[in-house]
Amino acid sequence: MNISSQNVLLPSPIPSSSPMASHKKSWLSKHPNQSMTFEKPQLGQFVLTPEPSSNTFYAPSSPASAVRREPLSPMSFVRMRSHRVNKIGRSSQQCDHVLSTVDKAISRVHAIVTCTQDRMIIECVGWNGMIVSDKMRKSVFHMKKNDRIVLVRPNSDACPVLDVFGYRVLLGWPSDSEDEWEGNLNAKNYEENREPMSPSPQEALPLMPSSPPSQDYQNDQNHLILYTNSESIPKLNLRSNELVYPPPSKDLLQKLLALEKDGQVEKSDCSKNTQLKPSFLPKNTDDLLNGTDDNNIVLREVKVSFENEKIESDDLDKNEEISEGEEYTPIEESKEPITVRRDSVIQIDESSAGLTDVISELNFTNHNDDSKNSNITTSNDSPVNEVEPMAPELSSAVVEKKEPEDYESISAVDENTNDSNESLPSSHDYSESTKENSAPDSLLLGLVLDELVFSTTSTTPLPALSHLFPSNMPLQLIQDKLRDLAAKHPYFEEVKRYGTDANGDPLWSEWFYNPDVDDDLERRMRYAPLMRPVRSSRRVHKQYYWKKPRARPRSSGHSSRRRRLS
């Protein structure tokens, strides 16, 4: 068989989940940039595909090799934001970057990308998977749903390519200046996340998909210069734990010159200290605000700055050198990529703070109060220029300070509560404890009716009404409370349900408002136009169980013929 060289086309440089031929007027008829042109395949022009793409219609297992592709066409480029969740898919409401709004082979949210300065975590949540190409290691990941991979940033910043059913996106690594100063964000990246549907924010790179994107290093250097030369940002001295401010403004220098002429400042001191050193706040800030510490605040700042001439530490110098000439030091690449499956991820519930945490916090605050009192007595004897960090204090309105004798009683109460958590409290005890804080029945009934009327369903289940009650109130007690209201008000009706659902959770009752039984005309006129009518079939719960169908005995043809004749 002779195949002309004109019909032989080179394959795509990147393995892709190529879509099949378009069905008539189906959602596969559109493709980005119209890069797919189909011709009638000749005999022997089929290419074997060991992993064919998912399709919703019948198609041959091997696509035609005559499918023309444009591997060198411009590809959409998305710059990832550091420490942000970037979503890619079909939905323009949920995703930061939209691949296609027509092709339903793409899920609403198909990929979730979380990126840092040196790592990129790509998770596939689409129904038919996707392909990630890491060109630095020349590896291709065929990801299925709920698969997750971790990519390490290479030295050349080569960007991975995300391929979802033929729609390719170049995932750019975050810029180095993004973590330093988030206020000076690039306007192009900001608009890119604001308008995921518009084609203008997406940078079209006239390069091969395997080559890294061109970066504007001048903009990154400008961001660094703006951050390091900003005079309004205070710098933290790690050793002395004090705030260090930049040199004073021209107004302060003019005041110093005026004081020098008056003779309040010696010329020898000013000649030695032509450049003012950072000033430090005194220990007693109340005297400073009232003006009793020193009548001349400017002179006090000058004296303190002259006395603390050599206070700058080596840690501050190191921090300044890092901020002025900060460069990214890439991490050595690993030979094999890190692959994480969802099954191996252990989900740990968040721990809630108990009474023991409150007791430890009280002990900590009491200890700090004693240390503060001792520090205040010593500070009155000898003035100290350093500012000590103050621990957060708990207000008396939130937590009452107790004596050490009361801690034993609190611990005993804590043990009793842990033992009693296994069994639900009785309704009588709970009602007695919350009688003072409980709302009147009329107000509670009005809130419940509002929830029922404005609900999206005709009948509302009990868990949807639990937010109207205290958070620590069990659902069983909420159901008893609602049944008490239903006994007093007949228009507040219940659909009783029994048994459990597929997860083994109990099926709670459903509630609805029946305006036909309500005698209050004003309430009926207010609620009837807004609510959805409840059919009679919905007012009785039907529990359905799956049962294996019974096989009917097949009769012979003679017997069936006899029945037809008879």
Curated annotation (Swiss-Prot):
It is found in: Nucleus. It comes from Schizosaccharomyces pombe (strain 972 / ATCC 24843) (Fission yeast). Belongs to the PLM2/TOS4 family. Residues 314-330 have a biased composition (Acidic residues). Pfam families: FHA. GO terms for cellular component: chromatin; nucleus. Keywords: Nucleus, Phosphoprotein, Transcription, Transcription regulation. One of its GO terms (biological process) is DNA damage response. This is Transcription factor P14E8.02. The modification Phosphoserine is found at S73, S379, S382.
